[in-house]
UniProtKB/Swiss-Prot annotation:
GO terms for cellular component: cytosol. SMART domains: MUTSac, MUTSd. It comes from Brucella melitensis biotype 1 (strain ATCC 23456 / CCUG 17765 / NCTC 10094 / 16M). This is DNA mismatch repair protein MutS. GO terms for biological process: mismatch repair. Keywords: ATP-binding, DNA damage, DNA repair, DNA-binding, Nucleotide-binding. Coiled coil: none annotated. Residues 1-11 have a biased composition (Basic and acidic residues). ATP binds at G658, P659, N660, M661, G662, G663, K664, S665. Residues 1-21 are annotated as: Disordered. The keyword Lipid metabolism does not apply. The keyword ATP-binding applies. Belongs to the DNA mismatch repair MutS family. The gene is mutS. One of its GO terms (molecular function) is mismatched DNA binding.
Length: 910
């Protein structure tokens, strides 16, 4: 955005008496008019080199940004609050506001103040909103996370049957996808994509069935007029946006999908106003093509971020070895949407296997990939008029790296996925790449208005203008030397002032050489006579002066024209540029997963359509790396076999018992993560893995209160368990941890017992079920597909040692008291707990609390002091020393008898 001179603010339209309300100035009236059309956004109102905010916007922005709140004029007798941010730093402030959930309308001066003055002294410079900045429509580099997609999502719904669909777009890369959904899957499908903003029809926003989903999403939901989602008008809107006469080449879309696509495009047009980001054609996702993971499972497994919202500690962070922004985003996309087709999974695994077999070549590929900038985002910024020279430079660097990669791969026998990627790279616009290389300078400025980004020699007129601009002194000195030689006046000078501009000055005594002849008079034009000097100009000098004065402006004008020319060429090649960039991301992900597999000792999983789930020596990918960083004991690998026990049978259930801190939750999670890694196309942390495709993954591991919705921990647990039991099928994988622990013991045991029976008889799926209710191990005698396994421990000197090994069998104790002692509970509390436990285990309470209180007085803990640790006394030490000094083999019978009496005496003194 180029700075413009701020116009002088006109006087108020009317100045009434001191007791009457003061009318607003024309400028403030303009502000209020524009603000009225953007009530849901903070208005950045351009005034010279600042964006100003007024009234409530100023109060909100000053608090959010930590900037000074001041005032400007009055309205209805009250001061008008005002704050402002400099234009050159606007992106930094926008980033903070967007992060806090605000939307911003950017209002620019759309004419020069000089033009406004021509309409009258009270005229205000024309302004208009050129863009609405919202969380889902960002393109600026500073506002985006290079490793994360920035999706805008729209929900479409048809009248009558209420069918639903979702369309999501990342305008920073052009990605555009659409898929049908259902009310019960809606929240899960939204959270899988994890959009920054969700736009819905205002009628749907207030729908009682859907509103709970929108309440969970919160501020990210933006209601819009229902007309934007009209499926009947969608075809025309799509044709207009993509500038096509028919949608035959786009494939078939259902009515709700057309509604969602229409809503997404309409919102982009609304926020981008005059700009039209180039988008890929909408790609339809088919139901069942990806592994269904509900939001609770995504959260508990910490796939992309931890429960506390951090990326560090997540599975994505643990497996990410990518070196490009596009590769990082593709890896995240694959992790959050694993495949369910064994054939497609095998294609990805083949790519990783090839990279492992060609390590030298892959190291060279990764070196080239490190030089690949974020081409899709650079292209999008250029397309919407927010790009700069460095975005063109990013394309040039990307083309150069792509060329190097194509050379490295020349003649290589590649698997199908990588072969297709190489073909896309080879189709990049080589002519445009060469054009950029010729046109762009080596060092590029951030802003196009700074100039200097076109290479010397690319444009002859530009070179001339630059020479005049940068070398005016040398040019003037050369012309002065020519005039001295021509006139013979050695004291002749070419000077400059603000009145005459450039002029020739000679002493009065030497002026005759320039005035004595008609030829001289026509050559040297008299400008001014001084007391001791005369000043002249020439046609040549006047033209040079004009050129020098205009050279800087003309040079910048030429550069800006070249910039627009290159930008238009880039947009014209958008499809091939994006295809090449996507191909580079595929190579980045494949080589990164190969590096991960080699570094961490992962194996290639065998994935098919069976119900098998046999993991040998499996490890938790995140915990294992954390232990290595801490130089702690190595991770203990464990097997897990949930495969059918006979051909044609259903998957098995493992009932896992064992102590607290024994590793049950880690074991449960690691098997879920191994399934996800395998189906995203990655090698897995195991000795071997045979996995029948999982279509739905459910994990209920850990729970917390949902106070905002009035739900206790136990209620949250029951809701999540209900969702699992109602949705899991034979191809599902279910991970359940400690069901029923949030209520009374017998209630919890009953619920857990019934849930396991239901999983076995009704869902008939592969499942891991961890519990502290040891009574449940009896189910193995009743349920043929259920096996008991336990976390092994070793007891030593009243302590417990956790071996973290899974073994056949059942635990008979939870070792909770020992864990409490390890956690640092006061010794008196631990002792009291041990006594209570012994009484309960002995069955002496007969279920009556009063008898337990009688046997073990509760308040005695508070009255008794902790026993001091035994201290070694001097006499004890003397006795011990005497015993230690004895040499039994050297004593005579008489000496032995005397020694006994001596030791007895010492013992008596002690």
């Amino acid at each position: 955005m180029e700075a413009k001179v701020e116009e002088k603010e006109p006087e108020p339209v009317e100045n009434a008496g001191p007791d009457a309300p003061v009318r607003l100035t024309p400028m403030m009236e303009q502000y209020i008019e524009i603000k009225a059309a953007n009530v849901d956004s903070l208005l950045f109102y351009r005034m010279g080199d600042f964006y100003e905010l007024f009234f409530d916007d100023a109060v909100a922005a000053s608090a959010a940004l930590g900037i000074t709140l001041t005032k400007r004029g009055k309205h209805l007798g009250e001061d008008i609050p005002m704050c402002g941010v400099p234009v050159h730093a606007a992106d930094d402030y926008l980033q903070k506001l967007i992060a806090k959930g605000y939307r911003v309308a950017v209002c620019e001066q759309v004419e020069d103040p000089a033009e406004a003055k021509k309409r009258g002294s009270k005229s205000v410079v024309k302004r208009d909103v050129i863009r609405l900045v919202t969380p889902g429509t960002l393109t600026e580099e500073k506002l985006l996370d290079p490793a994360q997609a920035n999706f805008l999502m729209a929900m479409g719904r048809t009248r009558g049957d209420g069918a639903l669909a979702l369309a999501w777009i990342d305008i920073s890369t052009g990605t555009f996808r659409v898929a049908e959904t259902t009310p019960d899957r809606l929240f899960a499908d939204i959270m899988r994509v994890d959009p920054r903003e969700l736009v819905v029809a205002d009628s749907a926003f207030h729908d009682e069935e859907l509103r709970p989903v929108f309440d969970l999403i919160g501020k990210a939901v933006t209601p819009q007029p229902a007309t934007l989602f009209d499926s009947a008008a969608a075809q025309t809107r799509i044709q207009h946006y993509f500038n096509v006469a028919t949608l035959d080449g786009f494939g078939q879309f259902s009515r709700p999908e057309l509604s969602a696509i229409s809503g997404a495009i309409a919102y982009i047009e609304k926020t981008q106003i005059s700009e039209r980001p180039p988008l890929m054609r909408p790609e339809r996702e088919h139901e069942g093509g990806t592994l269904f993971i509900d939001p609770a499972t995504r959260a508990s497994l910490e796939l992309a971020r931890t429960m506390s919202g951090n990326r560090d500690g997540s599975l994505l962070k643990a497996i990410d070895r990518t070196v490009t922004g596009g590769g990082a985003r593709l890896l995240a996309e694959r992790l959050t949407a694993p495949l369910t087709s064994p054939k497609e999974i095998a294609l990805r695994l083949d790519s990783v296997s090839w990279c492992l077999s060609e390590q030298t070549l892959c190291e060279a590929l990764r070196l080239e990939l490190k030089g690949v900038p974020d081409m899709p985002r650079a292209l999008s910024r250029l397309a919407v008029g927010r790009g700069g020279p460095r975005d063109l430079g990013a394309l040039a660097c990307g083309f150069e790296a792509a060329g190097g990669i194509a050379s490295l791969l020349d003649g290589a026998l590649l698997p199908d996925e990588l072969a297709a990627a190489r073909e896309a790279i080879e189709k990049m616009p080589a002519g445009f790449a060469a054009h950029l290389d010729r046109a762009l300078a080596d060092e590029l400025p951030l802003l196009k208005r700074d100039g200097g980004f076109v290479r010397e020699g690319y444009n002859s007129e530009l070179d001339e203008m630059r020479a005049l601009r940068d070398q005016s002194r040398r040019v003037i000195a050369g012309l002065q030397a020519d005039y001295i030689e021509e006139t013979g006046i050695k004291s002749l000078k070419i000077k400059h002032n603000n009145v005459l501009g450039y002029f020739i000055e000679v002493t009065a005594n030497n002026s005759g050489a320039m005035t004595d002849t008609d030829e001289a008079k026509s050559r040297f034009i008299h400008r001014q006579t001084m007391a001791n000097a005369m000043r002249f100009t020439t046609t040549e000098l006047a033209e040079l002066e004009s050129k020098i004065a205009n050279a800087a402006d003309r040079a910048l004008s030429i550069e800006l024209a070249i910039f627009e020319e290159l930008t238009a060429e880039a947009v014209a090649h958008a499809d091939s540029i994006r295809a090449a960039a996507s191909a580079l991301s595929v190579f980045d992900v494949s080589t990164a997963l190969a590096v991960l597999a080699e570094e961490q000792g992962y194996c290639r999983p065998h994935v098919d359509d069976s119900l098998s789930f046999n993991i040998v020596a499996g490890r938790h990918p995140v915990v294992e790396q954390a232990l290595r960083r801490q130089a702690a004991n190595p991770f203990v690998a464990n097997d897990c076999d949930l495969s059918p026990q006979r051909d044609g049978g259903d998957g098995a259930i493992w009932l896992l018992t064992g102590p607290n801190m024994g590793g049950k939750s880690t074991f449960l999670r690691q098997n879920a993560l191994i399934a996800i890694l395998a189906q995203m196309g990655s090698f897995v942390p195991a000795g071997s893995a045979h996995i029948g495709v999982v279509d739905r993954l459910f994990s209920r591991v850990g729970a917390s209160d949902d106070l905002a919705r009035g739900r206790s921990t136990f209620m949250v647990e029951m809701v999540e368990t209900a969702a699992i039991l109602n949705q899991a099928g034979e191809h599902s994988l279910v991970i359940l941890d400690e069901i029923g622990r949030g209520t009374a013991t017998f209630d919890g045991l009953s619920i857990a017992w019934a849930a396991v029976e239901y999983l076995h008889e009704k869902n008939r799926c592969r499942a891991l079920f961890a519990t502290h209710f040891h009574e449940m191990t009896a189910l193995s005698e009743k349920l043929e597909r259920l096996s008991n396994v336990t976390m092994r421990v070793k007891e030593w000197d009243n302590d417990v040692i956790f071996l973290h090994e899974v073994a056949k069998g059942a635990a008979d104790r939870s070792y909770g008291v020992q864990v409490a002692r390890l956690a640092g509970l006061p010794e008196a509390v631990v002792n009291r707990a041990r006594d209570v436990l012994h009484q309960l285990e002995a069955g002496e309470t007969s279920g009556k609390a009063d008898r337990l209180i009688d046997d073990l007085p509760l308040f005695s803990v508070m009255l008794q002091q902790e026993k001091p640790k035994p201290q070694i006394q001097a006499k004890d030490s003397e006795l011990a020393n005497a015993v230690a000094a004895i040499s039994p083999d050297e004593l005579t019978p008489r000496e032995a008898l005397d020694l006994i009496y001596k030791l007895k005496e010492l013992a008596g003194k002690a």
